[in-house]
């Protein structure tokens, strides 16, 4: 039984938006916002990896601000309304850690349509209400996809070590994460 069927079994109404692309675009987010509003939804569940979670974070920030364009929230803590709808993030891959982060990455296709650019928004209001990371959900992933996610983990794990904004605890955690990833990625 899939997650949607389980929700329906327990009496929850479910509306699905399944058009999120890798490296989610602003129009993915705004389409999700339109669906959310037209169906009178009251919460979000994102299922997947970083792209699904990031798009959902952007959508919930936009919904909390009466559907303002997600690109208006690029930068640090640009949202003014902390009363976002609840967001449950269910991970089916392990790569970005988006399900537990205050950051989300969106591709802006509207500011300069000839040169879309990715940006990061950091917002306390983007932190998910609940993150579900059940390794059982990863078992059905193809080996090649799991390896790609592992390299994504490795890239994200090394970022705090090489960042100019690092500090000793972040460097230690980064090194530990790199070692763990290297050890387990071989398996």
What are these regions (language model features)?
Residues 16-40:
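Helix-loop module immediately N-terminal to the HCX5R catalytic loop
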Residues 65-168:
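A glycine/threonine-rich phosphate-anchoring loop and its flanking beta-alpha core
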Residues 41-57, 92-99:
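Glycine/serine-rich anion-binding loops at beta->alpha junctions
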Residues 31-33, 52-65, 100-101:
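Short Gly/Thr/Asp-enriched flexible loops that form oxyanion-binding sites at enzyme active sites
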Residues 38, 59, 77:
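N-terminal loops that bind phosphate or other acidic moieties
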Residues 6-13:
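Short helix-loop-beta junction
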Residues 160-187:
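Active-site segments that bind and position negatively charged phosphate/pyrophosphate groups
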Residues 1-3:
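Short, small-residue-biased leader/transition segments that mark boundaries at the very start
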């Amino acid at each position: 039984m899939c997650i949607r069927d389980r929700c329906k079994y327990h009496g929850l109404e479910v509306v699905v938006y399944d058009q999120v692309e890798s490296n989610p675009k602003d129009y993915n987010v705004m389409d999700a916002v339109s669906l959310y509003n037209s169906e009178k939804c009251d919460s979000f569940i994102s299922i997947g990896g970083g792209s699904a979670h990031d798009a959902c974070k952007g959508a919930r920030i936009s919904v909390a601000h009466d559907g303002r364009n997600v690109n208006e929230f690029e930068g640090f803590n640009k949202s003014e309304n902390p009363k976002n709808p609840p967001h449950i993030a269910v991970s089916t891959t392990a790569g970005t850690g988006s399900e537990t982060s205050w950051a989300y990455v969106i591709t802006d296709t509207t500011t300069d349509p000839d040169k879309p650019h990715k940006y990061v928004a950091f917002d306390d209001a983007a932190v998910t209400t609940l993150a579900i990371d059940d390794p059982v959900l990863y078992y059905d992933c193809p080996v090649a996809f799991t390896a790609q996610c592992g390299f994504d983990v490795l890239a994200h794990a090394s970022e705090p070590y090489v960042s100019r904004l690092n500090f000793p605890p972040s460097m230690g955690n980064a090194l530990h994460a790199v070692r763990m990833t290297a050890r387990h990625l071989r398996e």
